């Protein structure tokens, strides 16, 4: 009887170790396919993909989908037209 118990222990321990090894192997293989395991760290891609059939795609015509690019952004410094002080600004007809 003792040999029978010993065989069942060996068989059950072999099955448990085989089962855990298989689960660990599958887990390691599946982790490689997750998006969090990417090796590429360029998450924020600043250059949009260009379409081959379009000369200029719609994503390059606008800034974040709100402002068209052909309108220039005004400078933050003082302009001659609005911020001149003195008599020169009174007589000057063009900026």
Curated annotation (Swiss-Prot):
Expressed in leaves, buds, flowers, seedlings and seeds. Detected at the base of pedicel, in the floral and funicule abscission zones and in vascular tissues. The keyword ATP-binding does not apply. Its main location: secreted. It comes from the Eukaryota. It is found in: Secreted, Extracellular space. Keywords: Secreted, Signal. InterPro entries: IDA-like. May be involved in floral abscission. IDL2 is only partially redundant with IDA. PANTHER family: PROTEIN IDA-LIKE 2, PROTEIN IDA-LIKE 5. This is Protein IDA-LIKE 2.
């Amino acid at each position: 009887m003792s040999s029978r118990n010993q065989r069942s222990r060996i068989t059950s321990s072999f099955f448990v170790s085989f089962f855990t090894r298989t689960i660990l192997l599958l887990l390691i293989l599946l982790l490689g396919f997750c998006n969090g395991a990417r090796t590429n760290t360029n998450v924020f891609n600043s250059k949009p993909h260009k379409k081959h059939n379009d000369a200029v795609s719609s994503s390059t015509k606008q800034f974040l989908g709100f402002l068209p690019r052909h309108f220039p952004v005004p400078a933050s410094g003082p302009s001659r037209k609005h911020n001149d002080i003195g008599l020169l600004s009174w007589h000057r007809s063009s900026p």
